[in-house]
Amino acid sequence: DSDTTWRLFGQLEWRASEHWLIQGGAMYEDTQLTGNSLTPRIAVNYLINPRHGLRAVYSEAIRSPDMFENNVNWSYRVTGLSTPVYGQNSAQYFVKTRGPGNLDQEHMRSRELGYNGYFVDQALNLDIKLFYDEITGMISEPLRNNQYIASNSNASRFAGTESQLDWQLSRADRLRLTYAYVHAQASNRLDQRLTASNSGSAGWLRNWGQGWSSALFYYGDSALNGYRFERVDTRIAKRLALGSKTSLELAGTLQQRLDHQPTTFADNLYDSRHVVYFSAELEF
């Protein structure tokens, strides 16, 4: 089987007046397996002044089922049989899974009310939003060989708030804070458990001079699929000037888990609670 997907998208912005800014966009998608769709986005911004604004946003999105979900033809071949079958040491497992072949797209509708403000004297940027998202036609069935019956019969709703604070404490120091609260409702209990009710982060970034910089971040959520998540990331970097417009950044990052929980699923367990990796970035 094969699939071909074409997408076309565009965006339009209209400055209606000194205080009103209208933004609109749309994406057209044509998929061989599921047909075509048009998803719009419109945002109305009211600028109280150049540094403070309110916004109302409505958008739609789709997710087309992948080829595995829609057209799977799945079975196992067993080898090394202790008792040969028809003189053969291998045989096809009796369970065979086939996709329905007629799945529709998942549809998401999102509504948002938000505020963004920059406080010059404090060098502080604040963004707060309220949102309500709903997904219909969800394909929620787990991909199991013995009981996979895919359908578009599930739905989810998410309501909550998100906030972000970016504070330039000094020329060298910067503080970032985020927090999100989500109330999730889903027809399939497995979908509902995959959303944490409370999550957030706190970070301190510092420029030490002479190309040295560091970042210290804490990430946490209350329960992701029933498991708490807490981690601290430490990053140290050195930027080397290689020319007037060329530079090389060498960095090392340590990720330290503060909990003893799996990541989302019970069998997602790391051998070590800390991970170290290095990176190199060339800009020219």
Predicted regions span which residues?
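Outer-membrane beta-barrel translocator domains and adjoining extracellular loop/strand segments
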Residues: 1, 34-40, 67-73, 80-81, ...
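Gram-negative outer-membrane beta-barrel transporters
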Residues: 15-21, 124-139, 151-222
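Transmembrane beta-strands of outer-membrane beta-barrel pores
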Residues: 4-6, 26-32, 58-64, 71-73, ...
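Membrane-embedded beta-barrel scaffold of Gram-negative outer-membrane proteins
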Residues: 47, 55, 87-152, 157, ...
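Conserved C-terminal beta-signal and adjacent last beta-strands/turns
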Residues: 56, 167, 171, 175-178, ...
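Hydrophobic, lipid-facing positions within transmembrane beta-strands of outer-membrane proteins
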Residues: 4-10, 26, 38-44, 99, ...
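Surface-exposed extracellular loop regions of Gram-negative outer-membrane beta-barrel proteins
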Residues: 1-45, 172, 176
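Residue-level signature of outer-membrane beta-barrel architecture
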Residues: 13-14, 28, 36, 46, ...
